[in-house]
Amino acid sequence: MAQARENVSLFFKLYCLAVMTLVAAAYTVALRYTRTTAKELYFSTTAVCVTEVIKLLISVGLLAKETGSLGRFKASLSENVLGSPKELMKLSVPSLVYAVQNNMAFLALSNLDAAVYQVTYQLKIPCTALCTVLMLNRTLSKLQWVSVFMLCGGVILVQWKPAQATKVVVEQSPLLGFGAIAIAVLCSGFAGVYFEKVLKSSDTSLWVRNIQMYLSGIVVTLVGTYLSDGAEIKEKGFFYGYTYYVWFVIFLASVGGLYTSVVVKYTDNIMKGFSAAAAIVLSTIASVMLFGLQITLSFAMGALLVCISIYLYGLPRQDTTCIQQEATSKERVIGV
């Protein structure tokens, strides 16, 4: 298996993680604003689809800049996109798996209490770590495993909301709910690590890989848009309810998605999870200032756990951002 050998500085990795965290936090706050203040609510499915298109266009532009000339740009597209249906199929896997994950998450939330859902869904964090170990032949120290589960607990506390009594009786199937959440958790871990493995297992340009994935992502989101809101979109229009704020949210989602791929390429999915947790804490603090959200004891404790877990995971350790070679490929001393 080939191995990508980009040498990037620690500063660049920290920069990408910091930008991804800040963009994700800003995106959460902006998204909340557009979904709670708009009189004419836009279709979230169309926003996701437009985001995929914008990420594709930006990736095409960055590939053109990377290749340096129109001829090399056309040759790269022809060789890696138009002439590589196998590679396109390979990169369609994450898009399809994420689509399954989103549907399973919705099914789980429909059959479980919100509090139970919040707790069980955070198992995607240790599941991602497990997939990293199994699929990429990496090893995590005991302290790293402790920090991963500590992060899981911290996110649960940060997002914890006490259960509220309701007069509406909804028929639920806990068994179906737990089954759906298990599939969603596995899909989350597998899709992220699969994409990381594809990125790091060859010297193919990151922007080529993004183009391959976003092409399939556009198809998947278009199908989802049609199935979810097709009738209403036909009546009201694809861009119904769009404002400058909605376009700003789409811009943040696009930039965040691109930085996520860079983070996965040059660090790993576990670090991406830590960044996402930090973004949750930052967005909640921002919501306190902007929307008057009340800080709870569980949030304070959870935020503390998140910070401690990030510190523990970042302690000096063996580098886990590159795919490890199999034991049989290690250097051996040959006696003559």
Swiss-Prot record:
Keyword Membrane (UniProt): yes
Lineage: Eukaryota, Metazoa, Chordata, Craniata, Vertebrata
Regions of this protein lying in the Lumenal compartment: 31-45, 109-114, 161-175, 229-243, 289-296
InterPro entries the record matches: Nuc_sug_transpt
Gene Ontology biological-process entries: CMP-N-acetylneuraminate biosynthetic process; CMP-N-acetylneuraminate transmembrane transport; N-acetylneuraminate metabolic process
Role of this protein: Transports CMP-sialic acid from the cytosol into the Golgi apparatus, functioning as an antiporter that exchanges CMP-sialic acid for CMP. Binds both CMP-sialic acid and free CMP, but has higher affinity for free CMP. Also able to exchange CMP-sialic acid for AMP and UMP. Also mediates the transport of CDP-ribitol.
Protein's name in the database: CMP-sialic acid transporter
Catalysed conversion reaction: CMP-N-acetyl-beta-neuraminate(in) + CMP(out) = CMP-N-acetyl-beta-neuraminate(out) + CMP(in); CMP-N-acetyl-beta-neuraminate(in) + AMP(out) = CMP-N-acetyl-beta-neuraminate(out) + AMP(in); CDP-L-ribitol(in) + CDP(out) = CDP-L-ribitol(out) + CDP(in); UMP(out) + CMP-N-acetyl-beta-neuraminate(in) = UMP(in) + CMP-N-acetyl-beta-neuraminate(out)
Originating gene: SLC35A1
Start and end residues of each stretch annotated as Disordered: 316-336
Membrane topology, record value: Multi-pass membrane protein
Amino acids binding CMP-N-acetyl-beta-neuraminate: 55, 101-102, 117-124, 188, 210-214, 272
Annotated family: Belongs to the nucleotide-sugar transporter family. SLC35A subfamily.
Keywords, sorted A to Z: Antiport, Golgi apparatus, Membrane, Sugar transport, Transmembrane, Transmembrane helix, Transport
NCBIfam families the record matches: nst
MF GO annotations: antiporter activity; CMP-N-acetylneuraminate transmembrane transporter activity
SUPFAM superfamilies: Multidrug resistance efflux transporter EmrE
Subunit text: Monomer.
Organism, scientific name: Cricetulus griseus (Chinese hamster)
Subcellular location: Golgi apparatus membrane
Transmembrane regions: 10-30, 46-64, 88-108, 115-135, 142-160, 176-196, 210-228, 244-262, 270-288, 297-315
UniProt keyword annotation of Cell division present: no
